[in-house]
Amino acid sequence: MSNTTWGLQRDITPRLGARLVQEGNQLHYLADRASITGKFSDAECPKLDVVFPHFISQIESMLTTGELNPRHAQCVTLYHNGFTCEADTLGSCGYVYIAVYPTQR
């Protein structure tokens, strides 16, 4: 078992972090490039299954419009159904790093 923490590093738990592979304006999720820090509740898990693809679609749209640029680091924050997603290319020209967590109130 690896102790690697993927995605944007945030001091928030629980958190899903991932390094998504960018191919044009499309993103690919690789399970071996993702990690969960902390434990999502039984109520949060099904919601996470719904919001995750929504966030991916929003990020892909931002890549299409140029709002998110693979060559320049710029963190964007998205909200949906009680969850927050932070995304940034970190200027990596091929990856989008994300952190998804329950919205803090």
From Swiss-Prot:
GO BP term (any one): positive regulation of cytoskeleton organization
Keywords for this protein: Toxin-antitoxin system
InterPro entries given in the database record: Antitoxin_CbeA, CbeA_sf
One matching Pfam family: CbeA_antitoxin
Induction: Expressed in mid-log phase at considerably lower levels than antitoxin relB.
Transferase in keyword set: no
Biological role: Antitoxin component of a type IV toxin-antitoxin (TA) system. Antitoxin that counteracts the effect of cognate toxin YpjF. Also counteracts the effect of non-cognate toxins CbtA and YfkI.
Designated name of the protein: Antitoxin YfjZ
Source species: Escherichia coli (strain K12)
Gene that encodes the chain: yfjZ
